[in-house]
C-alpha cells in the first residue's frame, strides 16, 4: 500500500502512513484545554463539598461537580497541508475553535488561529491558491460554506440551509462543489425539518451558483470531481423527519398517545439540532455527558445513526456496515451516465492520481475498478476520511 490516509472517528483523528500501523494524533492544544479545565475544577472543588447536606456547596455556589470525561474537545475536519508531510485540522472545544497545522514527520503541531465559538468542519485545501474551504456551523442550526485565507475566514454562501462538504474542482482555482439542504421553520422560527440534499457548483469569482443534482426522493452527498469531469457522490433515499404510516386500527391509540409522541418528537428534533451543532446528545439523565469510545448514536450527514443497531443488523457480514446498502457511491460521467461503485458507503475521497477510497463506517477500502475492493484499515465509527498527499 502506497497511500497516506487520515480519518475521523468520534472526534478523534487517526493517520495511516503506507503499511505502518494506524496511529491516533492527539492535539496538544486540545490536551491543554482539558488540563486547564481539570485544574480549574480542582481549584473550585471545595465549593462542591458537602453535597450530601441540604445546603451543600454546589447548591450555595450554583456549580456542579466536574467530570473530565464530559469535557468537549474534538477534531472536526482534516485536509492536506501546504507541504508534503503536513496536514491541516480543525478543532472544537466548548467555547473555542481553531485551525491547526500538524507535521507528522516531526510530530509537531502549530496553531494557525483560533476564535470564540468557531465551528468548522469538512476542510478542503485548494492546492494552487492555499485557500481552505470549510463548512461553518452556527447555533441556529444553519451552516454556510466559508473559505479561509491565512487567518481570515469569509462566508461564501448564505441562507437558511445546511451547506456542507465543499470540494475544489481539479484544474479550476475558483470553483467548488458542495451539498446543501434547506431548513424548514415554524411560525416561531424554530427549525422543524431538513429538506433533501442537492449538489451545487459555485464559481467564487463570479458568484454563479449552478445546481448539478437535485431530486426530492434522494439525498446527494459529499460531491467530488476528478480531472475527467466525472462526479462522484453518495446517494441515499431521502427521509422526511417524523414521517410514519400507521394502520387504521391504531388510530385510537394514536389519539391517546399523541401528546406523548409530540413531546418525544420535539425532544428528538432538539437532540438532532444539538448533535448538528455540538455533536453532543441531550440524553444525559442516565449520567454525565461522556465523549466515550462506546457512543451508540452519531449524526452522519444529517441523519442520526443508531450505531449499535446498525452493527447488530449487519453482524453477519465479515466487516459490518454502519450505514445500509441504500447509501450508494455513484460515479456520474459528464454525459449523464451513472455507474454504481459501492454500497453501504458512509464516506469517501479521491485524489488527482485516481486513487478512490471509501468507508462503510467500520473499515476503509480502496476501489480497484472491476475487481474486489482492497481492505486498507479496520476502525470504528468512521465519519470522514481524506487522502493525504
Regions found by a protein language model. Name each.
Residues 1-389:
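Sequence signature of WD/YWTD-type beta-propeller architectures
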Amino acid at each position: 500500500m502506497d497511500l497516506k490516509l487520515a480519518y475521523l472517528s468520534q472526534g478523534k483523528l487517526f493517520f495511516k502512513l503506507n503499511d505502518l500501523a494506524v496511529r491516533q494524533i492527539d492535539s496538544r492544544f486540545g490536551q491543554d484545554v482539558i488540563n486547564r479545565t481539570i485544574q480549574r475544577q480542582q481549584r473550585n472543588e471545595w465549593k462542591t463539598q458537602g453535597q450530601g447536606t441540604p445546603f451543600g456547596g454546589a447548591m450555595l455556589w450554583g456549580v456542579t461537580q466536574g467530570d473530565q470525561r464530559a469535557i468537549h474537545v474534538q477534531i472536526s475536519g482534516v485536509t492536506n497541508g501546504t507541504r508534503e508531510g503536513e496536514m491541516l485540522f480543525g478543532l472544537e472545544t466548548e467555547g473555542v475553535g481553531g485551525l491547526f497545522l500538524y507535521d507528522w514527520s516531526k510530530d509537531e503541531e502549530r496553531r494557525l488561529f483560533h476564535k470564540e465559538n468557531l465551528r468548522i468542519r469538512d476542510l478542503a485545501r485548494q492546492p494552487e491558491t492555499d485557500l481552505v474551504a470549510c463548512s461553518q456551523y452556527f447555533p441556529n442550526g444553519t451552516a454556510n460554506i466559508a473559505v479561509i485565507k491565512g487567518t481570515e475566514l469569509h462566508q461564501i454562501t448564505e441562507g437558511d440551509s445546511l451547506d456542507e462538504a465543499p470540494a475544489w474542482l481539479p484544474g479550476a482555482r475558483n470553483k467548488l462543489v458542495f451539498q446543501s439542504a434547506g431548513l424548514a421553520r415554524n411560525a416561531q422560527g424554530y427549525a422543524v425539518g431538513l429538506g433533501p440534499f442537492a449538489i451545487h457548483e459555485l464559481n467564487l469569482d463570479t458568484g454563479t451558483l449552478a445546481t448539478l443534482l437535485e431530486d426530492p426522493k434522494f439525498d446527494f452527498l459529499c460531491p467530488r470531481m476528478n480531472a475527467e469531469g466525472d462526479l462522484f457522490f453518495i446517494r441515499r433515499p431521502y427521509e422526511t423527519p417524523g414521517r410514519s404510516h400507521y394502520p387504521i386500527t391504531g388510530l385510537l391509540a394514536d389519539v391517546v398517545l399523541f401528546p406523548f409522541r409530540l413531546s418525544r418528537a420535539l425532544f428528538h428534533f432538539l437532540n438532532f439540532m444539538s448533535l448538528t451543532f455540538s455533536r453532543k446528545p441531550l440524553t444525559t439523565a442516565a449520567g454525565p455527558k461522556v465523549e466515550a469510545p462506546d457512543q451508540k448514536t452519531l449524526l452522519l450527514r444529517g441523519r442520526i445513526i443508531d450505531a449499535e443497531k446498525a452493527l447488530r443488523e449487519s453482524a453477519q457480514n465479515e466487516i459490518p456496515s454502519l450505514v445500509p446498502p441504500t447509501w450508494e457511491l455513484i460515479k456520474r460521467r459528464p454525459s449523464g451516465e451513472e455507474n454504481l461503485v459501492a454500497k453501504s458507503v458512509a464516506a469517501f475521497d479521491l485524489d488527482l492520481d485516481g486513487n478512490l477510497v471509501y468507508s462503510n463506517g467500520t473499515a476503509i477500502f480502496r476501489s480497484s475498478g472491476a475487481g474486489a475492493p482492497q481492505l486498507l484499515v479496520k476502525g470504528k465509527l468512521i465519519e470522514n476520511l481524506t487522502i493525504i498527499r
